[in-house]
Amino acid sequence: MLFRKKDESLAGISRAGLSKWYEVLSDRDKVRVRRYAEGAPENSAFDMLMHIARGAFGDENYDFAAEICSHAAGFADTEMLRYEINELAIDALFLSERWEEALELCRGGKDMYVSLKGSEHFPDLPKDLRFRNRTIDILVGYMKDYESANAALDEFFEIGIISEEDLRYRKNSLK
């Protein structure tokens, strides 16, 4: 039974077009991938990697989730998919306490949001914007940079991510 599951996972990885990627992984990472690949969609590399990253994230294996997100980003063929993987990577990096990397992805997430906002995908964008929330979490909680946090809130207001009322509330909470 154990070997059949392993073989099924490997076949799924192959069907998703990830054989070469999988071959160069460390033995430890191969075990992790097979574990999280169980039940993953096999129709695309991106979908399988997202499934693996979400599984790792759900197990609080944040460093591995972030690593898988970086691989998945290479298979994201639309701006919406890049945005989706970026949001997951932000949380994985944040929870791994990799603040600077997370903040860099937050900046990219903001840019992607602005780009997507005017597209046909805009209604699909979630209300919970990880790039926005984690930007403030990092600037205030880790860097203690209240000035930059206020500037970020102003920018979020300018691009329509937060309302004027929300801007006042959030700025007041920084005091």
Which residues does each PLM region occupy?
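Long, contiguous interaction/recruitment modules in multidomain scaffold/adaptor proteins
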Residues: 1-42, 64
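Terminal, low-structured helical/coil segments at or just beyond the last alpha-helical repeat
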Residues: 13, 145-175
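Helix-turn-helix repeat elements of alpha-solenoid scaffolds
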Residues: 18-30, 57-70, 98-115, 143-146
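Alpha-helical junction/boundary sensor with strong preference for TPR arrays
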Residues: 40, 69, 75-79, 106-120, ...
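Amphipathic alpha-helical repeat scaffolds of TPR domains
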Residues: 41-54, 78-97, 104-111, 125-139
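Alpha-solenoid helical repeat scaffolds
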Residues: 82-87, 118-123, 133, 151, ...
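Acidic, low-complexity, intrinsically disordered interaction modules
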Residues: 116-120, 126, 138-142
